[in-house]
Each structure stands twice: as structure tokens, then as C-alpha cells.
Design a protein with these regions (language model features):
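Short, conserved charged micro-motifs
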Residues: 11-18, 48-49, 189
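A short glycine-enriched loop-to-beta-strand structural element that forms part of the catalytic core
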Residues: 1-8, 26, 30-62, 70-76, ...
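Alpha-helical scaffold within the catalytic cores of cyclic-nucleotide enzymes
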Residues: 12-32, 55-58, 155-164
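Active-site core of bacterial EAL-family cyclic-dinucleotide phosphodiesterase domains
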Residues: 85-141, 179, 240
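The catalytic core of metal-dependent phosphodiesterases that act on cyclic dinucleotides
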Residues: 195-256
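C-di-GMP signaling machinery
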Residues: 50, 59-103, 142-148, 182-191, ...
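Helix C-cap/alpha-to-beta connector motif
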Residues: 154-180, 196-207, 234
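Structural preference for beta-strand elements that scaffold enzyme active sites
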Residues: 103, 118-120, 173-177, 207-211, ...
Length: 256
């Protein structure tokens, strides 16, 4: 990382974007693709410590990091609050998972005639200090930092356990839809993990539906489709959800 200080009257966003584009085109090849992020902080107090200026420009970058459609980000006062929130979520996550603070909620799914088909697995964080947290306050952060796979795996286990309970009680016609995020494909051996879970709980794979957004599939079509095809052949039902993402989605849209 490097810092450049320019007079406000000399700052030209288009010129900066053009230079970044040129740099990236010179550096990339068939294997590696360079992506540059620029954080812009407007200095309003010349007596402010240089380190603070640098940190604020970095905060602006952190807001768009991982989003390859973004290049330049401008600091605003909300960045500090957002960054502190993100850091606290990440710092508390592993302990919260270990302590059982995350809970699976089930949202019923019906067909057009009102017949119950099953449910979608949602997640809530029963935080000891902040109360019940909804997915929009932490899932995006976990996805951004790559640790969402730990929560996904936890929910998959809970869903399989619940299906086993239903089967034991004689309710053998219902499924639970679980979310598959982009990070799961990279941090987990997805095929072996999911087939291992249904084997562990002795349930049919057709009762554990895999919900994935088209956006996730399109991020690496070849790899994702190969894995999903293997899972479908094993017996899992694949659901494509385009109206929402992650545990915040409201309903299944269509089945592949």
C-alpha cells in the first residue's frame, strides 16, 4: 500500500481510474488478475495525525474490499462505526459458535395450494449483550471475511438433526432448505461434507435441499456446476434463489 497527498483542486477521479485501469492491464496475465482499490480521505484538519489520515483512507478501502466492481471509495464518518462493528463481529464469532449462541429458525414453505412442503433454515444470533441479532447484521461480514463456511456447516448439521427428529416422529415427507454460500465451495470439500452429514444422521439427501443464488453459481460456473451436478446425482435437490441471498432470503424461487 502507498499514500499520495494531492491538493483538492488537483484531484481528478476519472484520471485516477484511468491510471488504475492502465496499471492493471499491464500487470495481469492469463493466470493472475490485478485489482486495485483506492481509499480517498479529504483532509479537513491539517493538524490531524498522519497515521489517523492513513487509517481513515484504509477504512474507506475496507468498505469495498472484495467487491471487484468497485475501485474507489470515499471515507465518511460512518466508516469508523462500521469498521468497529465488523471487527467485533469477527472477534466474537468463534466463541459465540462454541457457546451455542447461534440458533436455527425454520420458515415454513408451502406450495400454491397451501400444502406444507418443508421449511427454510434461517439463523439468528442470540447475543448475550445485544440481544437477538438478525442475519443482515452479521452474515455479510462473515461472508466478506470468509468465515461464513463455519456458520453454514453448523446450520447444515442442525437441519439434518431436525430432519432425523421428524423422521423418527413419522413426518417423513418434509424437507429443509439450507443455504450454500460462495465461500463454502472454497473452504470446504462441499461434496464430502454434505454427503457425510446425511450419512451421519441417516437421512435421505432429498430431504436436505441445497439453496444457492445464481450470483454464486456465476462467480465460477464450471467448478460450481460440477460440484452441484455431483450432489444432485447423489440425491440432493438444488434450489436456485435469485430474490435474496444467504439466510436472509425469504423463499425458494425455483428448483433445478
Amino acid at each position: 500500500r502507498f499514500v499520495q497527498i494531492v491538493l483538492k483542486k488537483n484531484f481528478d477521479e476519472k484520471h485516477l481510474l484511468d491510471n488504475i485501469k492502465t496499471l492493471c492491464s499491464l500487470m495481469e496475465d492469463r493466470i493472475y488478475k490485478l485489482h486495485v482499490y483506492a481509499g480517498v480521505y479529504e483532509i479537513k484538519d491539517v493538524n490531524e495525525p498522519v497515521q489517523t489520515m492513513y487509517d481513515k483512507a484504509n477504512m474507506a478501502i475496507e468498505r469495498i474490499k472484495g467487491d471487484y466492481n468497485q475501485v474507489i471509495s470515499y471515507y465518511d464518518e460512518g466508516d469508523m462505526k462500521r469498521l468497529m462493528h465488523e471487527k467485533s463481529i469477527v472477534a466474537e464469532f468463534d466463541k459465540a459458535l462454541e457457546n451455542g449462541e447461534f440458533c436455527m429458525y425454520l420458515q415454513p414453505q408451502f406450495d400454491s395450494r397451501g400444502t406444507l412442503l418443508g421449511a427454510e433454515a434461517l439463523v439468528r444470533w442470540n447475543h448475550p449483550k445485544r440481544g437477538l441479532l438478525y442475519p443482515d447484521s452479521f452474515v455479510g461480514i462473515l461472508e466478506k471475511t470468509g468465515i461464513i463456511y463455519k456458520l453454514d456447516n453448523f446450520i447444515w448439521e442442525k437441519a439434518a438433526e431436525k430432519i432425523k427428529e421428524w423422521n423418527a416422529a413419522g413426518y417423513e415427507d418434509y424437507h429443509i432448505s439450507i443455504n450454500i454460500s460462495a465461500k463454502d465451495f472454497y473452504y470446504l470439500d462441499l461434496y464430502n461434507v454434505l454427503t457425510g452429514i446425511v450419512g451421519k444422521y441417516g437421512i435421505a439427501p432429498k430431504h436436505l435441499n441445497l439453496e444457492i443464488t445464481e450470483t454464486v453459481i456465476m462467480s465460477d460456473v464450471k467448478m460450481h456446476m460440477e460440484i452441484l451436478d455431483r450432489l444432485q446425482k447423489f440425491g440432493f435437490q438444488i434450489e436456485i434463489d435469485d430474490f435474496g441471498s444467504g439466510y436472509s432470503s425469504l423463499r425458494q424461487t425455483c428448483s433445478r
